[in-house]
């Protein structure tokens, strides 16, 4: 879902919908926790829990009574509570939470697609995500619109890595429309589609593409687990997350 943000509460509502979408797919397919098709969704949900928690905290900080507004700075470790320090802390939490959501969420989507490519033996001419995603979607018979969806989150992530400026491949612009929400990335210009609602909506639409991928006959007939190779390399176990 997408909702123009007028408050931290609106941000939290958009992130909640992303969480619910991930939960729906986890329950729909029922893959084991160490299968990349579940692990990716679980990990997107985990980072979303963090972002929604910060959004709710900032909302309470701005709207709460005097007691709440006194307690939160203490919990955050603010030794000096004035307008400037409160604003700086709030901005820092908001920006870092937003960056974490797109960075970690997009990584999980890209990692999942790489793992599926490896399992199905899908090769691409380049190691880059765009080419790997294109090769997989072509192999599964899915359309170019799905590739545009997956690329939208990647473009947001890349722009935030460049102080919000889009640097297109060979100077190219990129535009997409996700369920009526327009995303425009103009080379050399600051992007205006990297708000929390834009990020949550783009990730949710990418999760929808994962749903299409999981539903493809080639995946439905796959006889075994598709392990998360990144988790294996860094030594993560296959334990399920604890619900907050």
Please give the residue ranges for each predicted region.
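Charged/polar positions within long, soluble alpha-helices
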Residues: 113-121, 158-169
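Short, charged amphipathic alpha-helical segments flanked by flexible coils
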Residues: 122-140, 168-186
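Short, contiguous, well-structured surface segments enriched in hydrophobic/aromatic residues
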Residues: 76-77, 98-131
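A contiguous pocket-lining binding segment that forms or flanks enzyme active sites
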Residues: 133-163
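A structural signal for alpha-helix termini and helix-coil/disorder junctions
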Residues: 119-122, 139, 209-212, 216
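Extended intrinsically disordered or low-complexity regions, especially N/C-terminal cytosolic tails and loops
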Residues: 1-103, 144-155, 171-244
């Amino acid at each position: 879902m997408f909702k123009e943000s007028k408050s931290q509460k609106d941000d939290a509502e958009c992130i909640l919908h992303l969480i619910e979408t991930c939960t729906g797919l986890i329950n729909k397919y029922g893959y084991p926790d160490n299968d990349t098709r579940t692990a990716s969704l679980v990990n997107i949900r985990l980072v979303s829990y963090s972002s929604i928690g910060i959004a709710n905290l900032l909302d309470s900080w701005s709207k709460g009574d005097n007691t709440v507004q006194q307690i939160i700075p203490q919990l955050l470790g603010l030794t000096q509570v004035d307008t400037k320090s409160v604003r700086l802390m709030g901005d820092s939490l908001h920006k870092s939470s937003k960056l974490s959501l797109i960075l970690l969420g997009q990584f999980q989507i890209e990692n999942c697609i790489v793992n599926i490519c490896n399992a199905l033996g899908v090769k691409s001419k380049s190691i880059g995500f765009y080419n790997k995603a294109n090769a997989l979607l072509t192999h599964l018979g899915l359309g170019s619109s799905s590739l545009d969806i997956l690329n939208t989150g990647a473009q947001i992530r890349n722009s935030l890595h460049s102080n919000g400026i889009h640097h297109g491949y060979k100077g190219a612009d990129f535009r997409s429309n996700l369920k009526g929400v327009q995303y425009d990335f103009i080379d050399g210009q600051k992007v205006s589609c990297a708000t929390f609602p834009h990020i949550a909506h783009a990730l949710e639409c990418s999760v929808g593409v994962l749903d299409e991928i999981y539903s493809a006959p080639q995946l439905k007939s796959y006889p075994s687990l598709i392990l998360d190779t990144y988790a294996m390399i860094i030594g993560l176990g296959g334990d399920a997350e604890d619900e907050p």
